[in-house]
Design a protein with these regions (language model features):
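Phosphate-end processing signature that detects enzymes handling 5′-triphosphorylated RNA
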Residues: 2-268
């Protein structure tokens, strides 16, 4: 049974920093209809961890090379995601144990537009991610909206096998290179809440950057990230959020990640 969103309490995100908003105003906009032309559903993703101060530097260097997604005049957007897993956290455990082939099932709401999607993400042993999704009314209407049809085709589970585990909220900036061959998503003010333990945690000063592209096409931002000494680093919002908010889970695989994050935040 899926619980009501109204019962899943989570602290609201801070407003995006004023200086970040001012920097975003210097980028040419790209509209949502134009963004929909850039479909990277079969893609290679690479994540990077940075701080707000490093993000400010990156946005200065990226001017003239990227456009920023703009929706209803806003150049950053609010997201709310609920991750589903089996009662014994099978998908979390698969990731924790180092399996390259893994899967995530989530319900994501774009808070500024109100659109909600049931999504299945599959990663293969070559690091390529395939995402399939369908529009739904809410987490309460997954059965009526045909969620099992999507899961039967693309997941190892059906809705009856899954329960809500972890939710998060964050604010996302989306940049697109001038050639429209890649997306760069920049997530700020990431907050977690566990649906069972009711524990909250947050990475307010951490920035999660993800480069999304098909294959190994040229990426203008890679040299900029190297210049700022922003290095690739895995970061699963579901797994990190779970490890932070559920003390009963194994977390050995993620201990080094937490040490790295602490060091990064302390040095900036």
């Amino acid at each position: 049974m899926f619980v009501s969103l109204h019962t899943l309490r989570i602290v609201c995100s801070n407003a995006m920093e004023k200086h970040i908003v001012e920097l975003l105003d210097k980028f040419p906009p790209i509209s949502l209809p134009e963004m929909k032309e850039i479909k990277l559903m079969n893609r290679i993703d690479k994540k990077y961890l940075a701080t707000i101060s490093q993000l400010e530097q990156l946005l200065v260097l990226a001017q003239g090379k990227y456009m920023v997604q703009q929706i209803d005049g806003k150049r950053y957007n609010r997201y709310h995601t609920i991750y589903l897993d089996t009662p014994d956290e099978e998908m979390y455990t698969t990731h924790h144990n180092g399996r390259l082939v893994r899967q995530k099932v989530r319900v994501r709401t774009y808070l500024d537009s109100g659109d909600t999607f049931l999504e299945v993400k599959n990663k293969n042993n070559h690091g390529r991610t395939k995402k399939k999704r369908m529009s739904v009314g809410s987490i309460q209407t997954l059965y009526e909206d045909g969620g099992d049809i999507l899961l039967a085709k693309h997941a190892n589970y059906l809705l009856a096998d899954l329960v809500p585990k972890v939710e998060n909220r964050f604010e996302r900036i989306t940049l697109v290179n001038m050639g429209k061959t890649e997306r760069l998503t920049i997530d700020c003010h990431v907050k977690f809440h566990h649906c069972e333990t009711d524990i909250h945690d947050t990475f307010d000063r951490l920035v999660v950057i993800e480069l999304k592209r098909d294959g190994n096409v040229y990426s203008p931002v890679k040299s900029l990230l190297r210049e700022l000494r922003i290095k690739p680093s895995g970061f699963s919002k579901y797994c990190i959020g779970s490890a932070l908010t559920n003390p009963m889970l194994k977390r050995n695989r993620f201990k080094s990640r937490f040490v790295k994050i602490k060091k990064l935040l302390n040095n900036h």
